[in-house]
Design a protein with these regions (language model features):
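ATP-dependent carboxylate activation and anion-phosphoryl transfer catalytic cores
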Residues: 4-235
């Protein structure tokens, strides 16, 4: 279990309770103490690196809208960051990847609150939400992943990366709309949206039976707009 201490006076009791609970449950009273963030955003940075020390970042994504600690809507750029913050965290991330000697695509995830970034983890792969980065940069991340894995050099530097407009992704899940419990079954009618600056990634079709064995996500709706408001209207 976890305990929150919002002041020094609350720490001794919370610490004792956490130790006692850990001891009773796991026969060890060791506990881990870290800073508690009241209302953070979930912000992640997309990086791309080749095998020759060349690294670029492709901007950030805001993945704060979640249910059951799972992302449901993502957008780029993050509306909470300014250009200075974006440039600063971008340099930190690319410098770190160079020092690590990392190669291929990767995503570095942070919690962000009150102007400060707190590292969570790095995913050494593409993310579900990578299409919105493709929308605003014009870079095909799947293609680049294959190229650098095959030993190719990056064809551009950070100065060549330009961000245009705003993009959002909405995950479509086969779930009960009230309980969010996975809801497998036959799709009686499927009509995917389309049009300018609209993309749907899915394998669904009318008559398809959604199986009960996998994740409930069955489609991704990705939209682009010149502004955030335009993007929201299209979504």
């Amino acid at each position: 279990g976890m305990r929150i201490a919002r002041g020094a006076d609350e720490l001794p009791e919370a610490y004792a309770q956490a130790r006692a609970e850990a001891k009773a449950s796991f026969t060890s009273d060791e506990v881990y103490i870290e800073k508690y963030l009241e209302n953070p955003r979930h912000v992640e940075m997309q990086v791309l690196a080749d095998k020759y020390g060349n690294v670029v970042h492709l901007g950030e994504r805001d993945c704060s809208m979640q249910r059951k600690n799972q992302k449901v809507l993502e957008e780029t750029p993050c509306p909470a960051l300014n250009d200075e913050q974006r440039k600063k965290i971008g340099k930190i991330v690319t410098d770190a990847m160079k020092k690590l000697g990392y190669s291929n695509v990767g995503t570095i995830e942070f919690l962000y609150e009150n102007g400060q970034f707190y590292f969570i983890e790095m995913n050494t792969r593409l993310q579900v939400e990578h299409p919105i980065t493709e929308m605003v940069t014009g870079i095909d991340l799947v293609r680049e992943q294959i190229r650098v894995a095959a030993g190719a050099h990056l064809n551009y530097t950070q100065d060549d990366i330009h961000f245009d407009g705003h993009a959002m992704e909405c995950r479509i899940n086969a779930e009960d709309p009230f309980t969010f419990v996975p809801w497998p079954g036959k799709i009686t009618q499927w009509h995917a949206p389309g049009g300018l600056w609209t993309r749907v990634d899915s394998g669904m079709y009318t008559g398809y039976t959604v199986p009960p064995y996998y994740d409930s996500m069955i489609a991704k709706l990705i939209v682009f707009g010149k502004t955030r408001n335009g993007c929201l209207m299209r979504l």
